[in-house]
Structures are given as C-alpha cells and as structure tokens.
Regions:
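Primarily the internal scaffold of c-type cytochrome electron-transfer domains
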Residues: 1-193
Length: 193
C-alpha cells in the first residue's frame, strides 16, 4: 500500500468496508472503487436520518461525508493499520487529529468541557462514538459532533448520551447549546429532515 495514492488506499479499504453493489467482478488493488461498485446512499435503511451508520460496519458512506475525508489530507491508514487496527496508542489517541486540529488536541478541555485525561476529551469519544450492531462494536466515521437535537427528533445516537447513560438527550442538547454559540446542529437537522 506504500506505493498507492491516498485515493487508491481508501478505495482498497472500501472494497470490504462499503455497503455497495458490485458492478463487475474484476476489482483489483489500485483500481478505482466506483468503476467496480455502486455505493449505497444515505436513503438506505442502514443509516439514521442524519447519516450515521445504523447497520453493519460499512463505513465508506459515512466516512465520505466527513470533513476529514473531504479535506483529502488523510486516508484510512492514517488512523488504521493495514489490518484495520487503530494505529495510535491509548495515551496518544488524539494524535490522529493533529494534522488539522492541533490547538484542540493540545488543549482539549476548552473544546470538550471534560477533564483533559478523561474519556470525554478523546476526539473519538465525541466524533466517532461506538455503537453496537449484531454483537459488534463499530465507530461512526462521519466525524459529526454530538447532535442531541437529532436524537430528540430522529432517535439517532449521540456521543453525550452514549457515555452519560443516566441523562437524556434534552439534558445533552441544553449543554451543547450553552457551550457552542454557533448552532452546528441546525444543518444536521436540516439534512436529516
């Protein structure tokens, strides 16, 4: 994979980690994914209305809409080994986000409102929350921030309530609106409608 471009590496991962219909049977590494597969869209019942994965661990659709993928700066093996394991060790979890978010990685408390060494200050805890499906844990690859307003409207999971199980989405929504002056949930709600 070292000689491949970022697009080729992502396409190779996508051949297994995408919910798609095959168009051909000739796919080979370094081929263009979309020449051989028809990717499902967010209208598929395996997605929540906001685009988060509801079904199996097919991450390409949600990953494709993430700001990380859209930037073109990182690819699958930025965060994962070629066997799919997470590349960054526990104490360096947030280093995956350094290329674009250095200030937040170096001072997570201002952004997360959680203690710096807590689970709540790990980027992936809020932007890639783990959910269960068919006895399997999988993380959301859309990189959306927690959107409790979408939970209220559409029952889509949000990271706040995945950790704070004793609280409801209204509690989380109130906090998010206190902490963020910009309503980042609005566009997600609009897209989900």
């Amino acid at each position: 994979t070292k000689t491949m471009t970022k697009v080729q590496r992502n396409d190779l991962c996508s051949s297994c980690h995408a919910k798609a219909s095959p168009l051909t049977v000739e796919y080979r590494p370094e081929d263009r994914f979309y020449d051989h597969f028809d990717l499902v869209t967010l209208e598929d019942p395996d997605f929540y209305p906001d685009g988060r994965d509801l079904g199996e661990n097919y991450t390409l659709t949600s990953w494709s809409m993430s700001p990380c993928a859209k930037s073109g700066e990182i690819d699958c093996i930025h965060c994962h080994t070629s066997s799919g394991r997470y590349r960054f060790k526990k104490e360096k979890f947030n280093n995956a986000c350094l290329p674009c978010h250095e200030a937040r990685v170096n001072n997570p408390t201002d952004h997360t409102h959680h203690a710096a060494t807590s689970e709540g200050s790990k980027c992936i805890s809020c932007h890639m929350p783990m959910t269960d499906f068919a006895r399997m844990n999988r993380s959301d690859h859309s990189m959306l921030p927690p959107t409790p307003a979408v939970t209220i409207a559409y029952k889509s999971p949000n990271a706040c309530n995945i950790c704070h199980k004793d609280k409801d989405a209204e509690w989380a929504d109130k906090l998010v609106r206190q902490w963020r002056t910009r309503d980042y949930q609005g566009p997600v709600l609009k897209r989900a409608a």
